Amino acid sequence: LAAVDCSEYPKPACTMEHRPLCGSDNQTYDNKCNFCNAVVESNGTLTLSHFGKC
């Protein structure tokens, strides 16, 4: 099972870094920062499906 440490999020701004990950919502996030911000907003219901595009 893939995991990402989101303990230092949310952050007010994310870089444009392109390292896609796929969330459990079947949405592709551009990078860890965007993904982790979404995880925080979802109150932890969003998880990582896998690294790379969905």
From Swiss-Prot:
Q: What is its main location?
A: secreted
Metal-binding is among the record's keywords: no
Q: Recorded GO terms, molecular function?
A: serine-type endopeptidase inhibitor activity
Is Secreted included in the keywords of this UniProt record?
A: yes
What are the protein's UniProt keywords? Disulfide bond, Glycoprotein, Protease inhibitor, Repeat, Secreted, Serine protease inhibitor
GO cellular component terms, A-Z:
extracellular region
Location in the cell = Secreted
Site Reactive bond 3: list residues. 16-17
Q: Which InterPro entries match?
A: Bifunctional_prot_inhibitor, Kazal_dom, Kazal_dom_sf, Prot_inh_Kazal-m
Q: Which domain of life is it from?
A: Eukaryota
Instruction: Enumerate the spans annotated as Kazal-like domain.
Output: 4-54
What is recorded about the protein's domains? Avian ovomucoid consists of three homologous, tandem Kazal family inhibitory domains.
**What is the recorded name of this protein?**
Ovomucoid
Species, as recorded: Guttera pucherani
